[in-house]
Amino acid sequence: METFWLRVSFWVALVGGVISDNPESYSTNLSIHVDSVTTFRGTELSFVVTTHQPTNLALPSNGSMHNYCPQQTKITSAFKYINTVISCTIFIVGMVGNATLLRIIYQNKCMRNGPNALIASLALGDLIYVVIDLPINVFKLLAGRWPFEQNDFGVFLCKLFPFLQKSSVGITVLNLCALSVDRYRAVASWSRVQGIGIPLVTAIEIVSIWILSFILAIPEAIGFVMVPFEYKGAQHRTCMLNATSKFMEFYQDVKDWWLFGFYFCMPLVCTAIFYTLMTCEMLNRRNGSLRIALSEHLKQRREVAKTVFCLVVIFALCWFPLHLSRILKKTVYDEMDTNRCELLSFLLLMDYIGINLATMNSCINPIALYFVSKKFKNCFQSCLCCCCYQSKSLMTSVPMNGTSIQWKNPEQNNHNTERSSHKDSIN
């Protein structure tokens, strides 16, 4: 058993990225039944090894605190520093990547269209998580306690932290759904061409996405409280989900299934449905003189569709291990089983891997756009080199809405001016 734990600790140290740790579970021992050791954009495993149950905290379902596993968990110093380094890396990449993406879309008029507006909304949600949540995660990892735990600001952070975590994931999920719908609309209206700009319907969608994401995150702000506990003779407080009402008890019971269904399955199902419809639409309109005339636009729209599909696949790969771990713990794990300890240690390892991958999703979208989209690749290179508008050579590029745009020097003739604002409708 001791050798097994050494192996687990070793692999956790290797695969551990940022512990995107939601204070939802401050467990004291492997055998304690915890609501959700991990949730979205973070959940945490206990960083403090203790055998004291926090006071004012609901006991496990059987009302007992016995049947501990013979081994306890602890976070080694090496593991903390490894995760801190990776966390800082994700912070830098997420800050630079998402901020640059927002700047590109804001400063280039040819990039201001429906799908790019949704991508900007996606990047802004990731940026909020990176700027606010990651520093708190690193502090908790190194200090082993909740920041400002003894004053009111700590209580404010306890409410804000999980609220922003869940809101950020909601923004990601709903924007991916909106992008899938947008791609189908673009193909269904493939003969329509209109000017540059963000359609009103897309602006309404984005506002609705943010409002709905905040509303769905309200239970997190309500349920998370500062819970006092004793550790090594000293009094501490930590932030965790503590169900004190019937609604919160219900929310706590169905939370894993709710997260899996709405925050994971829904964008995948939505993408599958609308991409199937989009494929059928393309096959049905494969012939015809109008299609031949607009073949370039159709080709560009297919490229955009592939980019959106790539973002959805990355989302699925990043979040699947975490959801799988949560569902296995909900369905297979039995806290009263005497042989549960090895299973729980495996689930904890899956939690670490899943948490790290889920956290990386907040910085990977700009990287994916760089490699998938030639237009974004050119803009990233020019923007990061501080020469976005200083190019003296003619550059022909394809924005995310599938339009052929030409950038010309002021000295050149204006006979292509109309083409510079030519844009096919994807909305």
Curated annotation (Swiss-Prot):
Modified residues (Phosphoserine): S425
InterPro entries recorded: Endthln_rcpt, ETA_rcpt, GPCR_endothelin_rcpt, GPCR_Rhodpsn, GPCR_Rhodpsn_7TM
Membrane topology (Extracellular): 21-80, 133-159, 230-256, 329-347
Residue ranges with Polar residues bias: 405-415
Main location per the UniProt record: membrane
GO biological-process terms attached to the record: developmental pigmentation; enteric nervous system development; regulation of blood pressure; vasoconstriction
Membrane topology, from the record: Multi-pass membrane protein
Chain spans, region Disordered: 405-427
Keywords noted in UniProt: Cell membrane, Disulfide bond, G-protein coupled receptor, Glycoprotein, Membrane, Phosphoprotein, Receptor, Signal, Transducer, Transmembrane, Transmembrane helix
Chain positions carrying an annotated carbohydrate: N29, N62
Compartments (UniProt record): Cell membrane
Basic and acidic residues: bias regions: 416-427
A GO-annotated cellular component: plasma membrane
Disulphide bridges, residue numbers: C158-C239
Signal peptide: 1-20
Any one GO molecular function term: endothelin receptor activity
Spans through the membrane: 81-102, 113-132, 160-181, 206-229, 257-278, 307-328, 348-372
Residue numbers on the Cytoplasmic membrane side: 103-112, 182-205, 279-306, 373-427
Function: Receptor for endothelin-1. Mediates its action by association with G proteins that activate a phosphatidylinositol-calcium second messenger system. The rank order of binding affinities for ET-A is: ET1 > ET2 >> ET3.
Quaternary context: Interacts with HDAC7 and KAT5.
Similarity remark: Belongs to the G-protein coupled receptor 1 family. Endothelin receptor subfamily. EDNRA sub-subfamily.
PANTHER family in the cross-refs: ENDOTHELIN-1 RECEPTOR (PTHR46099:SF2), G_PROTEIN_RECEP_F1_2 DOMAIN-CONTAINING PROTEIN (PTHR46099)
Protein name: Endothelin-1 receptor
